[in-house]
Amino acid sequence: MRVARVNTQSAPTVTARLDLLDTLESEAIHIIREVVAEFERPVLLFSGGKDSVVVLHLAAKAFWPARIPFSLLHVDTGHNFPEVLAFRDATAERLNVQLEVADVQGYIDDGRLIERPDGTRNTLQTTPLLDAIAGGRHDAVFGGARRDEDKARAKERILSLRDSFGQWDPRNQRPELWNLYNGRHVVGEHVRAFPISNWTELDVWRYIERENIELPSLYFAHRRDVYARDGMWRAVSRVSAPREDETVESRLVRYRTVGDMSCTGAVESSAQTVAEVVREVAASTLSERGATRADDRISEAAMEDRKRQGYF
């Protein structure tokens, strides 16, 4: 008589691991879909900078093959790099996405805003931004902010509530457990959503390399007339001129972040490809904002002060 033998060995366990970029992409797409499902009129802040370009790319993947189900919004200070504005417009046209532009210069011309003595306009963006959000009845606003950029952004939630004045209260934030996001709000309030909050600058560049994402040319090494101020190379432009004691030099530089010409510094670099930028960023010990943004050096709490008033 034959006796059936029972296999007492457990079946082999099959595990599948996502690499870091896959995990970050999956989280970001989940956040984008969650916001679109929960809110009525979301909008994406799109400047043409690398972070907003990545968020837009993620949104396209999240809803492919359908169109991106929300519009883009940019606050144009009048001090933006021309190359970035051209890229912004071309990208919106290529993806067939509506682009709304809030114009700081218009606010200055009609007296609603006053030009700052130092000539910079970064802090002047808040009023046009909040007006555009209210005028468009946007209840959710996507942004490309990341926690590794600044200590104020490091403590902000992925879904961050703004009150009826557009203000952020860092002492009154909601808990976020795992992938559970609370978007509840009343009429007049809105929520800022940051899908790549957990990404680092290096993650962004590695993702750009993997996905072959196109960026403005300013992110790569090019020769430009610059002058040294406050430890940064500032570009010579119509809104940023050297003082009498500052010398103009022609140097090979690139931009790690593309804010206003009047407050954004370049870094010396020979990186002309994404792979070369990845290697450069991997060796860096300063965040891009800490290294190149004069507007963040006004005070230790410069970013938090602006965010409390409604800034990005």
Which residues fall in each region the model found?
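Nucleotide-activated chemistry modules centered on ATP-dependent adenylation/adenylyltransferase
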Residues: 2-312
